[in-house]
From Swiss-Prot:
Chain positions with N6-(pyridoxal phosphate)lysine modification: K273
Chief location bin: cytoplasm
Subunit composition and interactions: Homodimer.
Protein name: Glutamate-1-semialdehyde 2,1-aminomutase
Length: 434
């Protein structure tokens, strides 16, 4: 393996110990602290292609990809070159730039639901704005979200949220007023009957339904056949909006996102990660008649100092250009399918219960008998055994998400040799923890 079993992380340990006196929990996003897998987190020094190097010089095959953006591989040379050229013109204008038009046209041409788009600085910002827009357009205040679906850390969405909230075992967050979440209704993912019941109880007050079309923040959970179609029918019946949070799936499971992959067009879509090519970015878009509610075209206010900045736009444009090349998604699909199937085969060979799946460049597995169709069923995952697996994989040079409740990501940079090495590490690690 690339990294020796006697993993030396002395510099990482020292830096994280110091960081805990400087930043809450020593990190700037909770999942990075390794709380659910134990041990000290790995401090990275640099990344390139499919690999990450820590400050102690250990190299890892990376399957978090900066939590999704690095679909073309870390530090892709063409993206870096484009950014270097853009840097000579300045980092932020605080005024319109031509690059915004270019990326907006690319997004509109790619994503079926998007007729107009607004760029922001994060997925959280995009989801905050889209919720305000849902309410402004419909004149209704309630919204339905799904248990385990994560839409950023805004107050109104921290109800039965996934991602770091699930990792830390928090039902919600202190500091969120009950009045803020009173209009947030929740249903189990993949449960159309629960959604129908909520609409029956609140026929004239639900502005819409927001969901991850493929859940990635409660582990990897795909939609049941007919689930997305059912949501489209129900929302139309009640005059409510359907919103796909494609921050994770956008441009990852197909060039047009989950909506293009499954053939279901929502009214609004949120995006992020891939469209910024590794720089901070978010976006929301949809039908023109709805988007024209957004200021200054309409009365719904939303703004941002760094929104549409030239560096994020440049990285996004180049990334989408790379993704549009022939054969891109076929390669991603084949690479990820081989990895996901190999993981399950390795677990079963070790006598461990396992279930999992993949779609294009996104995958996941649970250490339990499946199938897992929602967040409640995901809790059957053996988190204690996963923690041991995570450490064993680190010692064998593979960096997995440090949580049972996060999807994994592949990239165009992952080679057949990388997958071979990863599966060998899984085989050894599963035998070790069985």
């Amino acid at each position: 393996m690339v990294t020796a079993a006697a993993l030396n992380t002395s510099r990482s340990d020292a830096l994280f110990t110091a960081a805990q006196q400087l930043m809450p929990g020593g990190v700037n996003s909770p999942v990075r602290a390794f709380r659910s897998v134990g041990g000290q987190p790995i401090v990275f020094d640099r990344v390139e292609g499919a690999y990450a190097w820590d400050v102690d010089g250990n190299r890892y095959i990376d399957y978090i990809g900066s939590w999704g953006p690095a679909i073309c591989g870390h530090a892709n040379p063409e993206v870096i070159e484009a950014l270097q050229q853009a840097l000579t013109k300045g980092t932020s204008f605080g005024a319109p730039c031509a690059l915004e038009n270019t990326l907006a046209e690319m997004v509109i041409n790619a994503v079926p639901s998007v007729e107009m788009v607004r760029f922001v600085n994060s997925g959280t910002e995009a989801c905050m704005a889209v919720l305000r827009l849902m309410r402004a357009y419909t004149g209704r205040e309630k919204v339905i979200k799904f248990e385990g679906c994560y839409h950023g850390h805004a107050d109104m969405f921290l109800v039965k949220a996934g991602s770091g909230v699930a990792t830390l075992g928090l039902p919600d967050s202190p500091g969120v007023p009950s009045s803020t979440t009173a209009n947030t209704l929740t249903a189990p993912y993949n449960d159309l009957e629960a959604v129908k019941a909520l609409f029956a109880e609140n026929p004239d007050s639900i502005s819409g339904v927001i969901l991850e079309p493929v859940v990635g923040n409660a582990g990897f959970i795909p939609p049941d056949f007919g689930f997305l179609e059912g949501l489209r029918e129900i929302t139309r019946e009640y005059g409510a909006l359907l919103v796909f949070d494609e921050v994770m799936t956008g441009f990852r499971i197909s060039y047009g996102g989950a909506q293009a992959r499954f053939g279901i067009t929502p009214d609004l879509t949120t995006m992020g990660k891939v469209i910024g090519g590794g720089l901070p970015v978010g976006a929301y878009g949809g039908r023109k008649d709805i988007m024209e509610m957004v200021a200054p075209a309409g009365p719904m206010y939303q703004a941002g100092t760094l929104s549409g900045n030239p560096l994020a736009m440049t990285a996004g444009i180049k990334t989408l250009e790379l993704l549009k090349r022939p054969g891109t998604y076929e390669k991603l699909e084949a690479t990820t399918k081989r990895l996901a199937e190999g993981i399950q085969e390795a677990a079963k060979a070790a006598g461990l219960p396992v279930c999992g799946n993949s779609i294009s460049a996104m995958f996941g597995f649970f250490l339990c008998d499946g199938p897992v169709r929602n967040f409640e069923e995901a809790k059957a995952n053996d988190s204690e055994r996963f923690a041991k697996l995570h450490r064993a994989m680190l010692e064998r040079g593979v960096y997995l998400a440090p949580s049972s409740f996060e999807a994994g990501f592949t990239s165009l940079a992952h080679s057949d040799a990388d997958i071979d090495a990863t599966l060998e590490a899984f085989r050894e690690s599963f035998q070790l923890i069985a």
